[in-house]
A protein has these predicted regions:
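N-terminal strand-loop-strand beta-hairpin
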Residues: 27-48, 52, 116-118
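Vicinal oxygen chelate
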Residues: 44-45, 81, 90-133
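Conserved secondary-structure micro-motifs at functional edges
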Residues: 47, 55-65, 73
């Protein structure tokens, strides 16, 4: 089912400062920076080998990411695993007793669908399944 780690999502308070850190200190450049109306966040992706680092800054104080930052502060928010079919994976995992946040996948970008698993079922880690069409 899981093919590989796609990315690690990190919640940040200031995306510009976080980008500066990754560029100047770690020496890597973002491959994509965009604002997501769906997640109410500004996002930057940094390729690092076969895995990407996703930096996420909320743009709305009522968003899920803003609430996460308020409660836990900056840091790792989720791990995303690539799968062939998010919806069939969600069905299979629910049959195995995994609690789901999403019963069906959601389209987050033109060619991507995602679904989240409840951290209570995944050792305290918010887990995202991602499918690229």
């Amino acid at each position: 089912m899981l093919e590989k780690i796609d990315h690690i999502g990190i919640a940040v308070k200031n995306l510009d400062e976080a980008i500066k850190l990754y560029k100047e200190v770690f020496g890597i450049e973002p491959s994509l920076i965009y604002e997501s109306a769906y997640t109410k966040a500004k996002i930057a992706f940094f390729p690092l080998g076969e895995v990407k680092i996703e930096l996420i800054q909320p743009t709305n104080p009522e968003s899920v990411m803003a609430k996460f930052l308020e409660k836990k502060g900056e840091g790792i928010h989720h791990i995303s695993y690539k799968v062939k079919d998010v919806d069939s994976s969600l069905v299979e995992l629910e049959k195995k007793g995994i609690q789901l946040i999403d019963k069906k996948s959601r389209k987050v970008r033109e060619n991507e669908r995602v679904g989240f698993l409840n951290p209570k079922s995944t050792l305290g880690v918010l887990t995202e399944l991602i499918q690229e069409d």
